[in-house]
Amino acid sequence: MTALNRQMRALVLDSYEEGTAFRDALINLPSPSAGQVQVKIFASGVNPIDYKIRQGIAPYAMPELPAVLGTDLAGEIVAIGDGVADFAVGDAVYGLTGGVRGLQGTLAEYANVDAELLALKPKN
């Protein structure tokens, strides 16, 4: 595993109240845990569940605040946690991660993602 303890930029939500804006913040970037890969995020989609979480109307998925929301991503693997054999540093991937129930979301420069939730980007 490559240790990458540093900071990254992220959009952080501090309140579910209507009219509350996301805050551009520097947050800690921990190394990936076992079974995870760290992805440098190139693109993050807006999934319908993201909108519901932001509005505070998806109690089954809402993280404790402050939180980084976002569930979908595309990017490149920059570090690999213990026990991950199907990916390598430099692999282009897409998939989903966090943004729900305390898992960091994709509205950030990087995310530590469960490797089972990712796929390799097709060559074509």
How should each PLM-predicted stretch be described?
Residues 86, 97-124:
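NAD(P)H dinucleotide-binding glycine-rich loop of Rossmann-like/cofactor-binding domains
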Residues 7, 72, 108:
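Short coil/loop residues immediately preceding or within conserved phosphate-binding loops
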Residues 25, 91, 108-109:
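Extracytoplasmic/periplasmic beta-strand context in beta-sandwich domains
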Residues 17-22, 48:
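Short N-terminal binding/cap micro-motifs at the start of the first secondary-structure element
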Residues 49-55:
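Cytochrome P450 core scaffold surrounding the K-helix E-X-X-R motif
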Residues 1-9, 14:
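Basic/polar N-terminal segments that are highly enriched at the extreme N-terminus
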Residues 28-45, 57-99:
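Glycine-rich beta-strand-centered segment in the early N-terminal region that forms part
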